[in-house]
Design a protein with these regions (language model features):
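Histidine/lysine/aspartate-rich catalytic loop segments that bind and position anionic ligands
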Residues: 58
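Rhodanese-like catalytic fold shared by cysteine-dependent sulfurtransferases
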Residues: 2-7, 13, 18-43, 62-91, ...
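Structural scaffold elements adjacent to functional motifs in cytosolic proteins
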Residues: 51-54
Length: 135
């Protein structure tokens, strides 16, 4: 009987090492979150410290963009640090024209270490006002 107790403890310890880890939060799971346009609008109304990132070309941005957005074309996002986005934990809300480039850019940003990326599709579905120029 006394031999069974140590053996039981060893087996119990070995089995606890076989459990699966808890799922990682989104920010640690090397992914971004996709949300609807309505969810994006609600998030913009609720949050204060966020960046709206337009990943279309400079020409598309100048023709019309969401007020307050900055432009960093998808094609320029790569392996180098992005000076306009110094805080990798800040909420960055990404959009493009139809939703394709914003998904690509969001994936690239996550690979660069950004942890709070939200992709909300394209300006084609934006119900709010837009502004033109390179403000």
């Amino acid at each position: 009987m006394q031999r069974m107790i140590p053996m039981f403890l060893i087996v119990a310890l070995l089995l606890t090492g076989c459990t699966t880890p808890a799922p990682k939060p989104v920010s640690e799971a090397n992914t971004y979150r996709q949300i609807t346009m309505q969810e994006a609008i609600a998030l913009m109304e609720k949050e204060e410290n966020y960046i709206i990132l337009d990943v279309r070309t400079h020409e598309e941005f100048a023709a019309g963009h969401i007020p307050g957005a900055i432009v960093i074309p998808n094609e320029t996002i790569g392996t180098e640090e992005i000076a306009q986005l110094p805080d990798k934990d800040q909420l960055i809300m990404v959009y493009c024209r139809s939703g394709n480039r914003s998904k690509q850019a969001s994936d690239k940003l996550v690979k660069l270490g950004y942890t709070n990326i939200v992709e909300f599709g394209g300006i084609n579905s934006w119900p709010g006002e837009t502004v033109s120029g390179m403000e």
